[in-house]
């Protein structure tokens, strides 16, 4: 067995750095937190080549004294705590004294600092070893430049992701810091290009505008709540302005960005049932509490914490969010629903000015579902620039009219089993007793009648029940998917081009994928300032084109795998749900046409979500139900 021996300081520093410095974003986080703890009001972050080549953080904080430079780069040396008691009463972002030592262990570091305006010091470290220290002119504050990250631990480089991903992680870190400290001015640049700039005027709404876009910030609701132990403040979106993941929920505890599943669930609970499934609000929630109630000494990144009285905080969060939405008329009371007059909906009332000219119509005229308003539906007006992402909810507000059948494209692809006519009469191709038909070929059905919800038809001696809404959903889905897969997607011109604002993270992702988005008929152009411009849109996105464009971009941003076919299927499903049909009585001509179109669909037996469309009852099934076989 090998002898036990003490590790060298250089090796122990590299091991410790592995816990604290995982990637370039970790360096940015640690240096910015040090700047904030030093009382800085201006912080500038510049990085080159995703931070691997160089990261520079400069602030106007308290600075470091000349005689403490060596100590600052020594492990477990800090000015933030001194006793064991301090460990349970932490009011700063950092406290372990590991950051500078860990960074210097895996990079070349140059620091220029001054704790007054009379003079400063410049020092250079490389792999934990100090190479130089000299007097230097410097304003009050600190400037640290980190170069060649992981130069002496090249194995770490293979665990990093693409340059774009590393840039986005840096941007996300600085976004959270800026939201947690609106009184501090942040400037972030990559290769000289500004990615974020906040003014430090203690205006959270303005910072949200700088990060997520002005239109979104203007519609955020003020959040306030207080209990003997906690105080909550911030801004939250309305239930119709959502995203497909939790990344836009920022929990800021005493200025520290944290991740906490239970608190996130408490935020969701505050929205009640107003959120669509798998949709998440945009929220910046600041929580102030006594440091004695939180233990941040849990994880090296300090993003996971332990809370005392966590259930009390959860209740306060849920109640405060519910009250904030109700005060802003985002949650209707039962009394309001009873007394408020119902308005009729007119597609012409939507604030969306379209050019009547159609460009690039090199394909046959396509089917576009026609809708008429449900007389009991309430109007939801939407502003331009996609501020409200999902205001047209999946609540069956529209009724598909008879013009559906007149406009259906007759070139719908037939079932691949359509030629196998001889299978239609086989008993083993269909499951009876009220179960879903599993045969691959639907016979020609003859319409007989209709209840409110279902059509009744027959073929020979068999009876068929057809769910009207699910049948229409199948037809709509097939048509939209066919449009998506077309080589020449017809475009509708806009009288006024639409300018889409994004968070800086999403803007960077989309900007690099503008060509890929053309697969979905979206010809976007870079407009600068975290914005893209859209001059035309695909015809099949009507009537809610604005919201549908945002939905497509949202799905694209959050895809976990680059499967275009799968993404197109998701898009077709989302648009179909937004064009949801309401059950209505059909005349015999309409009903027979629906059965004909259903027979020619890609799957006449279930809709795109797997919901049953048609059930067959044979004469034997009916005899059993009436107990005629006993």
From Swiss-Prot:
GO annotation, cellular component aspect: mismatch repair complex
Entry keyword set: DNA damage, DNA repair
An annotated GO BP: mismatch repair
CDD domains membership: HATPase_MutL-MLH-PMS-like, MutL_Trans
DNA repair found in the keyword field: yes
GO molecular function, one term: ATP-dependent DNA damage sensor activity
The keyword Nucleus is annotated on this UniProt entry: no
InterPro entries xrefs: DNA_mismatch_repair_CS, DNA_mismatch_repair_MutL, DNA_mismatch_S5_2-like, HATPase_C_sf, MutL/Mlh/PMS, MutL/Mlh/Pms-like, MutL_C, MutL_C_dimsub
Family: Belongs to the DNA mismatch repair MutL/HexB family.
Job description of the protein: This protein is involved in the repair of mismatches in DNA. It is required for dam-dependent methyl-directed DNA mismatch repair. May act as a 'molecular matchmaker', a protein that promotes the formation of a stable complex between two or more DNA-binding proteins in an ATP-dependent manner without itself being part of a final effector complex.
Name this polypeptide is given: DNA mismatch repair protein MutL
